[in-house]
C-alpha cells in the first residue's frame, strides 16, 4: 500500500510551508463509511494465522550461531560483538603510557580514511549497479547506511555512557544534599580568657562524683533475678506494703545501689536489704496544715515554679519534697476544693504562653467577670419621674398664686434658676449649661425688640395663646438621650421646667 507523498496536492489545497485547514471533498465523505463487516473480516483473517510456524522459526533461530543470525537479518560481520568490545576495553586499559588524546585523534583520522575509501568504493559500486537496476542501488545504499557501524572511539564512548545511564541504578544523592556533622577544631568557638570561670587546673566540683550503678559489671539476667529476690514478700508487710503488686519487675534504685556498694555481690546485697533499719520504700512525711496552706499560696503566686515556692513559702521542705507532695495533693479532695475556689486547673495559659487555644481563656474571663459584677437593679423611668415630680410639687406648694413664698419675698425663683438637668440623663451633660427660659419668646426673639415692630408683636401674641392652649392639654412624656432620640424617663424635667417658666411669666404680668 503506497503512502501519499507530502508534495501531492489535496482537494482542500496544496501542502506548502504555511499550514492550511483540511477541507475534505464530497467524494471523500462518500467513502467515509464505517462498516463493521470489515472489522469482522479482519479478525477472521488474523485468526487464520498459524502460530506454530513462528514458534518453529524462533526455535531454529535459537540454535543458530550468532554470525548466521546476523547475516540472516542483514547485518555484516563488521558489527562488533559484546565479547570483542570487552576484549578491546581490556587492551585499552593495559596501555597506560600512551596519550589518550593522540590515540583518539589518530584513531579518528585512520577510521575516517577507511570510511572515505569505503565510501569511494561504494560510490563506484553504486554507479555500476545504477546502470543495471536503479532500484537495487537505492536499497543497497539504504542498507549500507543502516549497517554502517560507528568506528570512532569518541562516539563509541558516548554510546557507552548513554547505555550506562539508561540502566537502572540506585539513586546516589549529591554531596551538597548530605548533612555534615560539624565536629572538630575548625568548628569550635574561641572563648576569650576572661570569660571562663574556672582556671586550667581547677576542678569544677569540689567533691568527687559517686558511682550509683555500673551495668557492665554484672550481666542483665543476674540483675533481673536479684530484683525479683529483692521485691519478694516476707509476709510481714503492713499497710500499703501489703497490697499485692504485678508480675512486672520494678526498678528498685535502693536495691541496685546496695548491690553497687557490695561490689555486685547479690547475696550480701540481699542480706543488707532485709536487715537494714532504713525501709526499702521511704514514706513521705506528713505535712502540717500550715505547710499545706503555704504551698497552696505559693501555687497561686508562682504557679508550678517549685524553686520559688520552696524559697519563699515552704522553707521547711526541699524542692523534691514539694514536687512529690504536689502530685499527691493533686489527687486529693483538697485539690478539688482549691481548683473550685481559684480555678487553678484551667489557668494553663498563664503558665504556658505558647498555647494558641484561647477558648478556655475567654470562658474563664467571662465567668469571672460575671461573678465579680454585683447585681444592681437598673433605675426605672417611673421611679425617677416620681422623685422629680415630688420635688417639683414641694416647690410649687411653697409658693402662693402671686409668686410670693410663705417665708418672704426674698425667695422668689428667678428664670435663670430653672435649668434642664434631665435632658441628658442617659448621656454626658454639656460643659456650659444654659438656662432654658430667658427674655426670648418661643421663636427665639427677644421681647424688647419685638415691641418695636407691630407685626412681630402680633405674631408673638398669637404664639403665646397657642402656648397657653398647649399647656392646658395633658403633657406628653418625652425623654431625650445623648443621641437625640426620644426615651422615657426625663419627660417630667422638661415639662415641669416649661410649666414653671410659664407660671413665672404670669407672676411678672400680675405684678
From Swiss-Prot:
- The answer, when asked if Cytoplasm is one of the entry's keywords, is no
Q: Tell me which residues bear Phosphoserine.
A: 10, 140, 159, 165, 366, 368, 376, 482, 487, 490
Q: Where in the cell is it found?
A: Nucleus
Position(s) of the covalent cross-link Glycyl lysine isopeptide (Lys-Gly) (interchain with G-Cter in SUMO2)?
238, 419
* Composition skew (Polar residues), residue ranges: 128-143, 397-408, 481-493
Compositionally biased spans, kind Basic and acidic residues:
17-36, 57-66, 413-422, 461-474, 499-511
Report residue spans for region: Disordered.
1-171, 365-511
Tissue specificity field: Ubiquitously expressed. Isoform 1 is only expressed in testis.
Alphabetized GO MF terms: histone deacetylase activity; histone deacetylase binding
- Is Ubl conjugation among this UniProt entry's keywords? yes
Keyword annotations: Isopeptide bond, Nucleus, Phosphoprotein, Repressor, Transcription, Transcription regulation, Ubl conjugation
From what superkingdom does this record's organism come? Answer: Eukaryota
List the GO cellular component terms: nucleoplasm; transcription repressor complex
Comp. bias regions, Low complexity: 1-16
Say where the protein is mainly found: nucleus
Which positions fall inside the SANT domain?
282-334
Renumbered to this chain, the Acidic residues biased-composition regions fall at: 37-46, 83-104, 159-171
Q: Which residues carry this modification: Phosphotyrosine?
A: 154
Protein's job:
Transcriptional repressor regulating the expression of a number of genes including SP1 target genes. Probably functions through recruitment of HDAC1 a histone deacetylase involved in chromatin silencing.
Assembly and oligomerization = Interacts with HDAC1. Part of a complex containing at least CDYL, MIER1, MIER2, HDAC1 and HDAC2.
> What name does UniProt use for this protein?
Mesoderm induction early response protein 1
Source organism per UniProt: Mus musculus (Mouse)
Protein encoded by which gene: Mier1
